[in-house]
C-alpha cells in the first residue's frame, strides 16, 4: 500500500502535506500529523456558536505563522483556523467534535497541545495521526519511577482491542508507545521530555483524554468486523 504519492509534488510545499493512498488530487487530500507536539496553547475563550462552539487560543510562536484554513491538531483533534492575529487564533468545533472529544469542557486558562500539519519535507518522528479522535479515555493512575512516569488509561473496549504492546497510540495528540494492554485500558511510559512539553505532564488522575488508535489498526479492525460478526465496529 502506497502511503505517499510524491510524483510531481515539490518537497518544499507549505504545510499542506496530506496522507495519500495512491494517486490523488489536492481536493481529495486530508491533513496528517506526527503526534509530536510543537507548542502548548492557552484557552482564551470558549463560546457557543450555533450547534457547536468557537475556541480561541493564545500562543505567540505559532499564531503569526498560521494561515486561514490551515489545519492544526488541538489536543488530538484536527481543527481549521478561522481567524488569527499576532498572538491568538480561533477554531470552530462542531457538535460531533464536542461530543467525541474533551474540547467541549475546556475553559479559559486551560492548556492544550498544538501541532501543525505535516509537510512532505518533514521527518515522521512519531506516527501518522489523522486528528480524527476515536473516543475519550481517562487517566487511571500515574506511577513515578525516577524521572519517568508510568500512566494507565481507561478506554472503551473496542479501542483497547485495536492496541498492541510496542504499537502506537495518540493521547491528546501525543504520539506514544503502548507498553501494556488490558480489556479496558492500556499503559504508556512518559519520558521527561514528554512530561515537560505536553499536557500529559500535569494532567491529573481522572482527567479525560482524547484517543486515536493507529491508522493501520483501524483497517485491520474493519476487515475483522466484516469477516467475524462478533467483532464490534
Where in the sequence are the language-model features?
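Extreme N-terminal basic, low-complexity initiation segments
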Residues: 1-12
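Conserved loop->alpha-helix
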Residues: 20-233
Amino acid at each position: 500500500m502506497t502511503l505517499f504519492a510524491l510524483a510531481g509534488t515539490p518537497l518544499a510545499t507549505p504545510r499542506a502535506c496530506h496522507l495519500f493512498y495512491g494517486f490523488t488530487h489536492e481536493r481529495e487530500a486530508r491533513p496528517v500529523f506526527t503526534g509530536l507536539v510543537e507548542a502548548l496553547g492557552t484557552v482564551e475563550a470558549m463560546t457557543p456558536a450555533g450547534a457547536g462552539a468557537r475556541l480561541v487560543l493564545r500562543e505567540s510562536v505559532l499564531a503569526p505563522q498560521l494561515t486561514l484554513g490551515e489545519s492544526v491538531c488541538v489536543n488530538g483533534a484536527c481543527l481549521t483556523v478561522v481567524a488569527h492575529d499576532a498572538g491568538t487564533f480561533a477554531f470552530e468545533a462542531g457538535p460531533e467534535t464536542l461530543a467525541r472529544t474533551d474540547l467541549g469542557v475546556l475553559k479559559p486558562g486551560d492548556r492544550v497541545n498544538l501541532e501543525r500539519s505535516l509537510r512532505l519535507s518533514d521527518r515522521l518522528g512519531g506516527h501518522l495521526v489523522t486528528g480524527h479522535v476515536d473516543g475519550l479515555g481517562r487517566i487511571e493512575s500515574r506511577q513515578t519511577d525516577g524521572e519517568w512516569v508510568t500512566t494507565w488509561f481507561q478506554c472503551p473496549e473496542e479501542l483497547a482491542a485495536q492496541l498492541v504492546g510496542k504499537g502506537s497510540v495518540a493521547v491528546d495528540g501525543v504520539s506514544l508507545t503502548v507498553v501494556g494492554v488490558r480489556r479496558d485500558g492500556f499503559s504508556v511510559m512518559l519520558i521527561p521530555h514528554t512530561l515537560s512539553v505536553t499536557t500529559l505532564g500535569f494532567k491529573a488522575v481522572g482527567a479525560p483524554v482524547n484517543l486515536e488508535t493507529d491508522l493501520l489498526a483501524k483497517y485491520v479492525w474493519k476487515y475483522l468486523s466484516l469477516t467475524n460478526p462478533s467483532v464490534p465496529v
